[in-house]
Swiss-Prot record:
Membrane-topology annotation of the record: Peripheral membrane protein
Quaternary assembly: F-type ATPases have 2 components, F(1) - the catalytic core - and F(0) - the membrane proton channel. F(1) has five subunits: alpha(3), beta(3), gamma(1), delta(1), epsilon(1). F(0) has three main subunits: a(1), b(2) and c(10-14). The alpha and beta chains form an alternating ring which encloses part of the gamma chain. F(1) is attached to F(0) by a central stalk formed by the gamma and epsilon chains, while a peripheral stalk is formed by the delta and b chains.
Name under which the protein is recorded: ATP synthase subunit delta
PROSITE patterns named among the record's database cross-references: ATPASE_DELTA
CC per GO annotation: plasma membrane; proton-transporting ATP synthase complex
Function: F(1)F(0) ATP synthase produces ATP from ADP in the presence of a proton or sodium gradient. F-type ATPases consist of two structural domains, F(1) containing the extramembraneous catalytic core and F(0) containing the membrane proton channel, linked together by a central stalk and a peripheral stalk. During catalysis, ATP synthesis in the catalytic domain of F(1) is coupled via a rotary mechanism of the central stalk subunits to proton translocation. This protein is part of the stalk that links CF(0) to CF(1). It either transmits conformational changes from CF(0) to CF(1) or is implicated in proton conduction.
Protein source organism: Klebsiella pneumoniae (strain 342)
The entry's keywords: ATP synthesis, Cell inner membrane, Cell membrane, CF(1), Hydrogen ion transport, Ion transport, Membrane, Transport
Domain of life: Bacteria
Family label: Belongs to the ATPase delta chain family.
MF GO annotations: proton-transporting ATP synthase activity, rotational mechanism
Database matches in InterPro entries: ATP_synth_OSCP/delta_N_sf, ATPase_OSCP/d_CS, ATPase_OSCP/dsu
Localization (cell): Cell inner membrane
Amino acid sequence: MSEFVTVARPYAKAAFDFAVEHNSVERWQDMLAFAAEVTKNDQMAELLSGALAPETLSEAFIAICGEQLDENGQNLIKVMAENNRLKVLPDVLEQFIHLRAASEAIAEVEVISANQLSDEQLARIVSAMEKRLSRKVKLNCKIDKSVMAGIIIRAGDMVIDGSVRGRLDRLADVLQS
């Protein structure tokens, strides 16, 4: 987790509350995603760490974003620039996404496997996890050859390790004790 999460959280909460109030959550997430990508640009990163006046910086940032930001998105950029916080935009986006997922009762579940899983396998995992967590599930699939075979499922603090690597590690622990 980034060191800027504490700084980013109030901006994300304000943006999320505004977006919910104005029924524009998807639009706000898109604006924040675009603005976060702009901060990752090498030239923009240089400007963000430079000594530009906040007003000049916000004008430059808004000009680069162009039509991607509506008036309210531009206002957020201005406030963040005044407080020298534009560099935390990626963390604002991350926090916004977490707030959205929590409000929509969606659990993010990470599935790690040695090989690409079929659509049928993914559907079975989604079904089982939705039943177990009592909420909708969004899968984030990763491939890690060190798993060897089987899968590892992570949802918050819960970890289900059905991998060959996990079994071998547990067997090694038993043999050593």
